[in-house]
């Protein structure tokens, strides 16, 4: 019980630091006049909102019996496994790195899909960029699903900036800010920012390319 409480306190402390870091980056961009005050305010609000939703989803999943705070397996007639595969496969890859097995990984000495779900669905493989990204975070000590998602949330900052810049090509400032707000409130986009998925990273890259 004491170890569990200690683990939760450490996770909470790291989560607070990560949220403050994200807002700190946004404030730095504002101070450097890279973004204006209105965009800084909107971006900070949504970082806070996404962080809160992430934490609520995590504890809801914990209370629903999902040990690691991620939804996976057969639930309400559907099978969920994307977060599961990213989470557990990155853990395996991180262990290989900690054991000094990088050379073996590069040689392909391990199975292409070492993690298999309970429904015999293979993982994404160790060549998957997002799996590698999560494994590196785990390698430096960021292991909880909440903290992994919060780190990933950093991509919302350039997403909001480039969406605003794209909107300003065609719209005035007020309408551009409304565009960013509406986009940020889309249910699907909220999920990509609050679950262990790579979709928000892909959207960010797409906006940068379009700009």
Predicted regions and their residues:
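Transmembrane-helix motifs of polytopic, lipid-linked glycan transferases
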Residues: 24-31, 150-170
């Amino acid at each position: 019980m004491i170890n569990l409480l200690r683990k939760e306190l450490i996770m909470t402390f790291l989560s607070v630091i990560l949220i403050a870091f994200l807002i700190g980056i946004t404030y730095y961009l504002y101070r450097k006049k890279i973004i204006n005050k209105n965009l800084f305010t909107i971006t900070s609000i949504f970082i806070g909102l996404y962080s809160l939703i992430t934490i609520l989803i995590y504890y809801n999943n914990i209370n629903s019996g999902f040990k690691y705070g991620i939804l996976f397996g057969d639930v309400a007639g559907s099978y969920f496994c994307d977060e599961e595969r990213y989470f557990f496969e990155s853990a395996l890859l991180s262990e290989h790195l900690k054991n000094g097995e990088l050379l073996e990984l590069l040689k392909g000495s391990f199975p292409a899909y070492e993690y298999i779900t309970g429904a015999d669905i293979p993982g994404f493989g160790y060549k998957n960029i997002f799996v590698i990204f999560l494994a590196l975070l785990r390698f430096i000590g960021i292991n909880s699903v909440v903290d992994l998602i919060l780190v990933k949330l950093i991509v919302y900052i350039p997403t909001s900036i480039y969406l605003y810049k794209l909107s300003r090509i065609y719209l005035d400032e007020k309408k551009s800010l409304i565009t960013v707000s509406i986009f940020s409130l889309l249910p699907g986009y909220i999920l990509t920012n609050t679950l262990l998925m790579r979709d928000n990273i892909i959207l960010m890259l797409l906006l940068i390319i379009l700009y």
